[in-house]
């Protein structure tokens, strides 16, 4: 890992009312693994600096200098609302990374894959799904994605068109769409029924702290060993 690098914003994509995907060009980017993140540093005209961490949403381009970050604008936040809506395309920030070596998955990690995400916690999980699709892995993969309402789903179009071998299940905690067979509510043991067996499945859980702790307890109770569960939390 090197120090701070200049990163130029090249594209902003709306995911939800407050969620954005930001694409940056980072000269001499060293590459990264699915699940890793970066630190982003902003410097004001008076020299004041603020640093925040954001997950990488896509696997590394082969020899490319492009990175894609997911940013959820936090109400009253100092940095995320500015990045989400106000940083001009063409402007530069600084990034450090890639960071993190625990919450990562690569196509060499064979076996069934169970991904569980809450809200914007789907961002690093999306990098894993995209890397899996690019590798043409034949191992089964399941995504359980918990959001408050249908309009808070990140990457909705891409998830609707999930590739063969990927099962996507959306879980709504506050407002379920009309016709949904599952009532709105937090994830429960019943939601884990029919998931890949605990014996050889790799589990990745990402989301707010309370969500991750709750899901971790459910997985352990369902027989998934602690050595098979990797977590990333925020908030």
Task: Please give the residue ranges for each predicted region.
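Conserved beta-strand elements of the Class I
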Residues: 114-115, 204
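Reductase modules of NAD(P)H-dependent flavoproteins
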Residues: 2-6, 140-235
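Ferredoxin-reductase
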Residues: 1-91, 147-149, 172-175
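Short, conserved phosphate/pyrophosphate- and ester-handling motifs at nucleotide-, phospho-/glycolipid
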Residues: 35, 121, 208
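A short, basic/flexible loop-to-alpha-helix module at the beginning of a structural domain
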Residues: 97-109
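Histidine-anchored nucleotide/phosphate-binding helix
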Residues: 124-134
């Amino acid at each position: 890992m090197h120090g701070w690098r200049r990163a130029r914003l090249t594209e902003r994509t709306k995911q939800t009312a407050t969620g954005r995907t930001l694409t940056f060009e980072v000269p001499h980017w060293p590459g990264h693994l699915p699940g890793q993140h970066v630190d982003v540093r902003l410097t004001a005209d008076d020299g004041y600096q603020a640093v925040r961490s954001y997950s990488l949403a896509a696997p590394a381009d082969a020899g490319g200098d492009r990175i894609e970050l997911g940013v959820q604008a936090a109400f009253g936040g100092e940095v995320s609302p500015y990045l989400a809506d106000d940083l001009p395309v063409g402007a530069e920030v600084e990034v450090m990374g890639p960071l993190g070596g625990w919450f990562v998955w690569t196509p060499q990690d064979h076996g069934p894959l169970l991904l569980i995400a809450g809200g914007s916690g789907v961002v690093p999980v999306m990098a894993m799904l995209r890397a899996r699709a690019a590798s043409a892995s034949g191992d089964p993969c399941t995504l359980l994605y918990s959001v408050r309402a249908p309009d808070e789903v990140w990457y909705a179009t891409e998830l609707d068109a999930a590739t063969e071998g990927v099962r996507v299940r959306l879980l709504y905690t506050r407002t379920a769409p009309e016709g949904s067979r599952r009532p709105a509510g937090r994830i429960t043991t019943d939601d884990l029924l029919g998931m890949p067996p605990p014996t050889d499945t790799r589990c990745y859980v990402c989301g707010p702290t309370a969500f991750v702790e709750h899901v971790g307890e459910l997985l352990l109770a369902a027989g998934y060993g602690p050595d098979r569960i990797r977590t990333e939390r925020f908030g």
